[in-house]
Amino acid sequence: MRFKEVGLLFCQLLAVLIFAAGFFPQKKVLKGDAQFQYMAETQRALEPAFDKLVLVVIDALRADFLFQQNVSHFDFVHELLNRGEAWGFTAYSNPPTVTLPRLKGITTGSAPNFLDAILNVAEDDSSSNLKDQDSWISQFAKHGKKIHFFGDDTWLKLFPEEFFQKHDGTNSFFVSDFEEVDTNVTRHLPHELQHKDWDVLILHYLGLDHIGHKGGAASQFMPPKHREMDAVIRQIYDQVDNRTLLCVMGDHGMNDLGNHGGSSAGETSAGMVFISKMLSSYPRPAAQDGVSSPVTAAEDYQFFTRIQQVDFVPTIASLFNIPIPKNSLGVFVREFSSLLGQHATTKIIENYHQLMQLAAKKTAARGNDDIDSMLAEMKDVQATLARTATNYNYAMLFLGVGMLSIVTAATAYCYISSARLNEASVLMIAVTALLGSSVFGSSFVEEEHQIWWWIIIAVVGYSWATRPSCTPSHLVFLVCARLLRGWNNSGQKFMYDFTVAELLKSHPSIKWLLVCATLAVVALDGFTERPLLSIFNLLAGLLCFVYKTCWANVNGEVSPTYAQTLVTKACSLLFAGGTPWDDKQLLVPLARLFFKVTAAIVCMRIAYNVVFAKRKFLSELFPLFTIVLIMQTASQNIPLFLVFTIMRSSLRNILRVGYPQQRCEMFFVLSLILQNLSFFQFGGTNSIATIDLTNSYNGISENYNIYVVGLLMCIGNMAPAIYWSLAAVVDHQLYSKKSYAQQKLSSMFFYSVNSLLLLVACICMRYHLFIWSVFSPKLCYLLGWNILIHFLTETVLEPFLLMVAG
């Protein structure tokens, strides 16, 4: 690419990054540890309601997993609820519903920072550390309490190790494991419960969350995991006294696909239950009184009393008689006032003073009879503070917008002045204008897939009407597009039970036949011209199929007999040595072998091309790249690459016959449309809840590497977009008379204009109700598309391949 285009691209990326740095700043927080404010001497002399705290965090424990009939298998918890020794709540978790910001909320009571959702996956990030921020953890440590911690090592990223007298962290992102990751926590229990040399015991279990990511909320592995966690709760309950409070909670919930990060009811409704033998001596919460557990299904997962998750913080602080953390937005849970007796009013007034100080409001003297109005006012202040929790850096916002405005103007000038006025350029300008204007509506952002669907239908319909000679190809393309449309659920507002992907899950024989057919068709593409390379591709395809079958077996999916036989024979040849390996042991070596074989084939083909330059270099490598993308794709989506192959063939025929003078220009524009359409129809959305981690660990052992996992995650989630981007550059090499930089101007124009308009929309909507659940994730996706597709794929990888091709 020419220096001018590269310079514009770097300036565009820099402008968006500057804007993001101003839009997602670290929040300003009150430093230091809190002290009692109201009747301080009296409070310091009070006895706590409990002596010890056991906190069991079950990652992604949705409220229905804990309370709902036919869903929950926490039988012992239900028994305790019915005896009054457990009080249940549905705790609302503010989005983004990922672990790191939710743990911040649970421990400090503060509102989440959306940047934490991004930092959540950065293993070596230290910017989220809470060493200098007040929390009930730091308060317990300051008061000389001994804290033992076992589980998700996110806690060790948040808090200094000196806060914990004993700790053992487990990696939270190796989602392929949902057994050992919990066993490593539970193995500490016998010793901890026997010696009880702690005041606070924190256990954070990850297995349930991993099961959700792997198989969804209704996975066959969910009931056994519920029972396992229920047994842990029973084990703790049986060995602690009535002066110990056991709290079981989810840090967030999950949607039906098993993902989280967004703002749907399932993701924000976490279960929470307080357990103690002492509780049966006090009146139950009104919502629980006379109700038998497990309960029937509730609308939007609202079971028993609904509280804010941050309300846990002042409640725990009050029950254990420590100051409420300075930055807490929580409001004391009124149901626990009976445990504090005559001092309940003192604690509520203390909470009132703390919250008003955080809101910078003056507090007037209050009488004991004003408790109800005080709690109501606190709830109002809580809601206001939660909405205005972020301090935007306006200098960086406007610098980013100003810089991007200049870049966009320059890019638009270069594109419009160099482009011929034809159907391809008009279509690109129309698509850019339509998408750019749509970002100002939250519903358009949530349902963006609808826009791309109607764009492709309109374009193909227009082409069919004006070029009827290509009727068969148009018809085939439309049939494939409709099949693509119905393959998965897309968007965030509506879910459908009968999708092609769900049907394939329930008919595994058909699914695996289609997987075989897809790999065979892709691998043997061009067999008559390059039989040797096709055989190598077939070897890579075979390794991919064997790995996918093993993965399915390990994760409880059904695979047909012929697939099992193939796996057995292939593995006996590949891993001979006398020691039989089970499918789980084979996963990592199989994936690594696949990537090594693929890399060897690519290197061999590049070396061959250096000696014998061939114009079809990229088209010969394209099937192998497609197999790599298939490797990073969920099995039910793999047949879509067969659909893509048919669509690509039809599209090339339409352009060859109907658009001979603008073939490559039109393919570039249609490639951009199909990148976005196929991304959404693969199940993607503009919510971080649909980021799929399933294939992020192919070939990764327990030695978690953020960079490798991040790369695999990006390839897996952007596989369809990468496919269509590479398809466009293959056609460019074969047929284009223009330079790649000239062709690339069209996509640069699209990305620049849409980036600018989204940044403007984010400024306009910064106090909108959906700023964190809709516009902020969209901004994150904009960064992802710009970096992964626009920069790494189209500006780094594709020009490199064209250079090698000569």
Swiss-Prot record:
It is an enzyme of class 2 (transferase). GO terms for molecular function: CP2 mannose-ethanolamine phosphotransferase activity. Pathway: Glycolipid biosynthesis; glycosylphosphatidylinositol-anchor biosynthesis. It comes from Eremothecium gossypii (strain ATCC 10895 / CBS 109.51 / FGSC 9923 / NRRL Y-1056). Its EC number is 2.-.-.-. This is GPI ethanolamine phosphate transferase 2. Glycans are attached at residues 70, 184, 242, 488. The lineage of its organism: Eukaryota, Fungi, Dikarya, Ascomycota, Saccharomycotina. Ethanolamine phosphate transferase involved in glycosylphosphatidylinositol-anchor biosynthesis. Transfers ethanolamine phosphate to the GPI second mannose.
